[in-house]
């Protein structure tokens, strides 16, 4: 008997646990937080009766809407109390209106400062223009009118900042100013690079290194600066000078001779060189690249018979009387230049008269010719031929 009870005890214990679990499950299902009925049908009937009761006393609304209305009412009461408190301490206004008023004040203050600054700049600009007119009373009328138009335009621009067309014009003017400044900077940089290149390359001679000895509509004669002034590399060439000749078609360089040895080189074009001697004359046809040497004192002239191409040549001048100094004697310009090389006795014997008379008649005329040359009254050295 005892053995039978012991063998059945675990089974009874398991059945008891299952029974308790089922009772607890049924109890939990029938009770929801201890507030609603056990049966779903009873809960539904209770809800319907509650709604009918609320409808009799007033309009019915769900519970969550009532809670939202209560919160909104609390916020409204708090806002009204805050407004009353602000009214007691001073003039009241909504917070967003206060912020807008502050922004409006800042904007108005900024506009006033900007207008004051523009008026100040305009006044200063007009005063400077007035001072310039007083300092420069001889200015042209159109320059004064341009200044006045510029002042009016700036005034109109300051008054019409909000005009789209005015803003477009201002933007165009600023872009043009920036473009001009950029071009100016590029020009300056190019000039600096050119100068640096010239310093790096002493063998490069620009056109501004030449001195114009003669120029007219038919051509020019130019003298290059001394080589030793260009660089220390040319110190041994201080006794050498370079002369450039240019002549248009159908022109002639009038006869002359120079107190220096010449090495003539044709750079472009064709020429006929005629060399005069006491008993004869010789002519040479020269083309590009031809070179010829003329001794000091040789009288010669050049002709450009080409119909289209200009004649351009250079002379390497080697003075014989002084280092780096030479003089050209032009027969057509001043015949009395030849008298400089003769002494007083030779002149008296040649002209069979007193030196004072020779000096008065010939040398004074030579001095007048020299003064006329200094004043720019040069006789043509290059003339047109038919």
Swiss-Prot record:
SUPFAM superfamilies: RmlC-like cupins. InterPro entries: Cupin_1, RmlC-like_jellyroll, RmlC_Cupin_sf, Seed_Storage-Functional. Residues 33-199, 367-386 are annotated as: Disordered. Residues 41-65, 74-91, 104-144, 153-186 have a biased composition (Basic and acidic residues). It is found in: Vacuole, Aleurone grain; Vacuole. PANTHER family: OS03G0336100 PROTEIN-RELATED, VICILIN C72. The gene is CVCB. Keywords: Seed storage protein, Signal, Storage protein, Vacuole. One of its GO terms (molecular function) is nutrient reservoir activity. This is Convicilin. Residues 1-29 form the signal peptide. Seed storage protein. Its main location: other. One of its GO terms (cellular component) is aleurone grain. Belongs to the 7S seed storage protein family. It comes from Pisum sativum (Garden pea). SMART domains: Cupin_1. Gene3D superfamilies: Jelly Rolls (2.60.120.10).
């Amino acid at each position: 008997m005892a053995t039978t009870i012991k063998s059945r005890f675990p089974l009874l214990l398991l059945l008891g646990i299952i029974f308790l679990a089922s009772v607890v499950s049924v109890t939990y299902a029938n009770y929801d937080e201890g507030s609603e009925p056990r049966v779903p049908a009873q809960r539904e009937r209770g809800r319907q009766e509650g709604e009918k009761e609320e409808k009799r006393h007033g309009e019915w609304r769900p519970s969550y809407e009532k809670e939202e209305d209560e919160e909104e009412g609390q916020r409204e009461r708090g806002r009204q109390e805050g407004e009353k408190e602000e009214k007691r301490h001073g003039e009241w206004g909504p917070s967003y209106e206060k912020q807008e008023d502050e922004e409006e004040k800042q904007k108005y203050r900024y506009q006033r400062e900007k207008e004051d600054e523009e008026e100040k700049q305009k006044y200063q600009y007009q005063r400077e223009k007035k001072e310039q007119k007083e300092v420069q009373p001889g200015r042209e009328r159109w320059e004064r009118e341009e200044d006045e138009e510029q002042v009016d335009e700036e005034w109109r621009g300051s008054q019409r900042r909000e005009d789209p067309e005015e803003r477009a014009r201002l933007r165009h003017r600023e872009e043009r100013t920036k473009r001009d400044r950029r071009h100016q900077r590029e020009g300056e940089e190019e000039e600096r690079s050119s100068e640096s290149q010239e310093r790096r390359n002493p063998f490069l001679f620009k056109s501004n290194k030449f001195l114009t000895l003669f120029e007219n509509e038919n051509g020019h004669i130019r003298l290059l600066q001394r080589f030793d002034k260009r660089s220390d590399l040319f110190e041994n060439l201080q006794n050498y000078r370079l002369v450039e000749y240019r002549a248009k078609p159908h022109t002639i360089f009038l006869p002359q001779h120079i107190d220096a040895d010449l090495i003539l080189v044709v750079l472009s074009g064709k020429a006929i060189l005629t060399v005069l001697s006491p008993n004869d004359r010789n002519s040479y046809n020269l083309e590009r690249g031809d070179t010829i040497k003329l001794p000091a004192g040789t009288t010669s002239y050049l002709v450009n018979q080409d119909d289209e191409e200009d004649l351009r040549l250079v002379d390497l001048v080697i003075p014989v009387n002084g280092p780096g100094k030479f003089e050209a004697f032009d027969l057509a310009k001043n015949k009395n230049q030849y008298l400089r090389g003769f002494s007083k006795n030779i002149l008296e014997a040649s002209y069979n008269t007193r030196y004072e008379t020779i000096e008065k008649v010939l040398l004074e005329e030579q001095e007048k010719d020299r003064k006329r040359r200094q004043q720019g009254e040069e006789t043509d050295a290059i003339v047109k031929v038919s």
